[in-house]
């Protein structure tokens, strides 16, 4: 395997968003240059709002809370304690296979949730992973995806709602979606599931896609 996993910090050692972004860019440059293997960063962020390239002004926090503009796709979202973040920085085997990459990210998260009895699905026309409307409520998003591919190497990634407070979402139009809500693995199961609880399973599931996704650079560490 040439894919590396690096756990930067989980509760209580939250990672500042800008610190994590700087590290992403540094690793991205090295992967592009063939100086480092493809790497997946795993962490929990300190609380922050981030705005993708498609964010509109009316979707920003209603109380004027600062927002970090980022170069990923998608719109406005929140990251913070209780949410597992994974930033795959991968040299894609198929540069044109971005849709396949996104679908694999969704499949990885769905497989992890199945272990906890959560019936998560994808919804046509909407990125991320969802719980369909049931007696608990309307359609609700349980995991988000926002990526960028530059020089054939991915950045940004996924956010899985494990045990995070949903109050910050009340201040924004999350991901530009007005007709659905958000949820967490803990809410769906009725028991506390923290990011640290699912890391090993996430890594295991992600590793199954290594050969299909990742191009092995010449001289990569084996």
Swiss-Prot record:
Q: Name one GO cellular component term.
A: cytoplasm
What PROSITE patterns does the record tag this protein with? BPL_LPL_CATALYTIC (PS51733), LIPB (PS01313)
Subcellular location, record wording = Cytoplasm
Q: Where is this site: Lowers pKa of active site Cys?
A: 141
GO biological process, alphabetically ordered? protein modification process
**Pathway, per Swiss-Prot/TrEMBL?**
Protein modification; protein lipoylation via endogenous pathway; protein N(6)-(lipoyl)lysine from octanoyl-[acyl-carrier-protein]: step 1/2
List, from the UniProt record, the residues annotated as the active site of this protein.
175 (acyl-thioester intermediate)
Q: From what superkingdom does this record's organism come?
A: Bacteria
Its catalytic activity? octanoyl-[ACP] + L-lysyl-[protein] = N(6)-octanoyl-L-lysyl-[protein] + holo-[ACP] + H(+)
Main subcellular localization, coarse class?
cytoplasm
| Keyword Cytoplasm (UniProt) | yes
Q: Specify which residues bind substrate according to the UniProt entry for this protein.
A: 72-79, 144-146, 157-159
Under the GO molecular function aspect, what terms does this record hold?
A: lipoyl(octanoyl) transferase activity
Residues forming the BPL/LPL catalytic domain are: 34-214
Tell me its family: Belongs to the LipB family.
Q: Which HAMAP family match?
A: LipB
Function, as annotated = Catalyzes the transfer of endogenously produced octanoic acid from octanoyl-acyl-carrier-protein onto the lipoyl domains of lipoate-dependent enzymes. Lipoyl-ACP can also act as a substrate although octanoyl-ACP is likely to be the physiological substrate.
| Stated name of the protein | Octanoyltransferase
Q: Which species?
A: Paenarthrobacter aurescens (strain TC1)
Q: By which gene is this protein encoded?
A: lipB
């Amino acid at each position: 395997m040439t894919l590396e996993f690096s756990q930067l910090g989980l509760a209580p050692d939250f990672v500042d968003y800008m610190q994590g972004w700087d590290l992403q860019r540094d690793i991205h440059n090295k992967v592009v240059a063939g100086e480092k293997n493809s790497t997946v960063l795993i962490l929990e962020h300190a609380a922050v709002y981030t705005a993708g390239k498609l964010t509109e002004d009316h979707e920003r926090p209603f109380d004027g809370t600062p927002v970090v503009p980022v170069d990923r796709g998608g719109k406005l979202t929140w990251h913070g304690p209780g949410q597992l973040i994974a930033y795959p920085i991968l040299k894609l085997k198929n540069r044109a296979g971005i849709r396949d990459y996104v679908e694999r990210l969704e499949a990885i998260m769905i497989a992890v949730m199945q272990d906890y009895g959560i019936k998560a699905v994808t919804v046509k026309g909407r990125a991320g992973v969802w719980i369909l409307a049931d007696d608990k409520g309307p359609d609700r998003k349980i995991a988000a995806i926002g990526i960028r591919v530059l020089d054939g190497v991915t950045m940004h990634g996924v956010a899985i709602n494990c045990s995070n407070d949903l109050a910050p979402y009340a201040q924004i139009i999350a991901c530009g979606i007005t007709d659905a809500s958000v949820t967490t693995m803990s809410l769906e199961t009725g028991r506390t599931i923290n990011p640290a609880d699912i890391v090993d399973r996430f890594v295991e599931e992600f590793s199954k896609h290594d050969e299909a996704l990742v191009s092995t650079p010449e001289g990569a560490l084996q």
